Regions:
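Residues on the lipid-exposed face of transmembrane beta-strands in outer-membrane beta-barrel proteins
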Residues: 107-113, 169-173, 197-201, 241-245, ...
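Transmembrane beta-barrel architecture of outer-membrane proteins
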Residues: 104-106, 164-166, 192-194, 236-240, ...
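Outer-membrane beta-barrel biogenesis signature
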Residues: 51-82, 317-356
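Outer-membrane beta-barrel translocator/channel fold
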Residues: 130-160, 212-248, 258-266, 274, ...
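Phosphate-interacting basic helix/loop segments used at nucleotide- and nucleic-acid interfaces
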Residues: 179-182, 190-193
Length: 357
């Protein structure tokens, strides 16, 4: 909202006579989120200052995103279609039976290229600096388990010094009336490649939303960095129906519940609860229970974890939406594992939240 205030001030400095309303439409990854309408006369009074005791409320409202008509005058922010950045990466797991603290430290180089306003191609190359996953000795599932090893080959993947983490194409589209969609395909994460789609319904300034995603993926080979561009024989259909809820009595809390099929073919649900603080820091936890029995799952019985997400603008001199996430997963096992998609529509449409600030 500070961005809206700054934009309004800039527009007012060069505003032609006779303009009654300023409309500012926010976009994220070229998806229109929301249009903020501000009455010029009201804004002018606020900028000039009002007499003490005679202050009025700024005449401003949020509406569904609008595209300027041909008869309207407008401006837009011109951004480069190509972007490249390098980021530090720390993956970690706490409390495992093999070693209490396991980590992987590296750097990730990412290149993004917008082919069109809706089609994004993106790829990331990971360089491994240090890790202690040689102590991850989980090589055989429980004898009575029928779960395929969808995550416990992690040691084999991270022993490669440099590898393509993801290389994919995403097509994003605003479908109107609060609906958003995306389709994607390629190497979607370290361990899986394939194709999928997601649709989200998120009414403006609502405290709830619903989404569904469906994917067909194959497991990437782990024997070498070159082999990671190939696939094993294992493939699976995975997807979830997800509900998002910000309780009216605790609007800084997000409750996320999903049901569907996981990477090992097991079916069940995940409950995630996260708390956002005034600083922007988010602390959350999750648990997943599926039809895989505790004996099939192995030590730990079910998948669970906690995480902390920190906005990087706390440490930056300029505004940024980037965040750093630190997660703790007590055990890495094969049951209840979701596909690690790079883009999720709910996070991409945060400007539509009733709590957006």
């Amino acid at each position: 909202r500070e961005g809206i205030e700054r934009a309004n001030r800039i527009v007012m400095n060069d505003l032609p006579d006779g303009i009654r309303t300023i409309r500012i439409t926010e976009n994220r990854l070229n998806l229109p989120q929301v249009t903020t309408e501000t009455e010029v006369s009201s804004l002018k009074r606020h900028l000039e200052g009002e007499p003490l005791g005679h202050e009025t409320q700024l005449a401003q409202k949020r509406v569904e995103p609008m595209v300027p008509k041909t008869t309207e005058q407008g401006w837009y922010i011109d951004k480069s279609r190509f972007d490249f950045h390098i980021d530090p990466v720390l993956n970690q797991s706490v409390g495992g039976p093999e070693n209490f603290y396991m980590y992987q430290l590296g750097v990730m180089g990412t290149a993004d290229w917008w082919v069109t306003d809706h089609l994004l191609t993106t790829g990331s190359l990971f360089a491994n600096l240090a890790n202690n996953y040689d102590k991850f000795n989980y090589t055989n599932p429980p004898q009575d388990s029928h779960l395929p090893r969808v995550r416990t080959h992690v040691r084999d993947y991270v022993q490669n010094d440099v590898y393509v983490n993801n290389l994919q194409a995403n097509y994003f589209q605003s479908l109107g009336n609060g609906f958003y969609g995306q389709v994607y395909g390629g190497y979607l994460e370290t361990m899986y490649g394939g194709a999928g789609a997601e649709v989200l319904y998120r009414p403006l300034d609502s405290n709830w939303a619903f989404g569904v995603d469906a994917n067909y993926v194959k497991q990437r080979d782990w024997r070498s960095a070159q082999d990671m561009m190939k696939f094993t024989d294992y493939s699976v259909k995975t997807g979830h129906l997800t509900a998002y809820w910000n309780p009216s009595f605790a609007q800084d809390v997000l409750v996320k519940a999903s049901v569907g099929q996981y990477l090992a073919g097991d079916k069940g649900g995940t409950l995630e609860i996260a708390k956002r603080f005034d600083s922007g820091v988010v602390v959350g936890g999750y648990a997943t229970i599926t039809n895989a029995s505790p004996d099939e799952y192995g030590e730990g019985d079910f998948t669970k974890g906690v995480y902390v997400s920190v906005p990087l603008d706390l440490f930056s001199s300029g505004p940024t939406r980037s965040r750093a996430a630190i997660g703790w997963t007590p055990l890495t096992r094969d049951g209840g594992q979701q596909l690690g998609r790079k883009f999720g529509l709910y996070d991409m449409t945060s400007d539509r939240s009733v709590n957006f600030r």
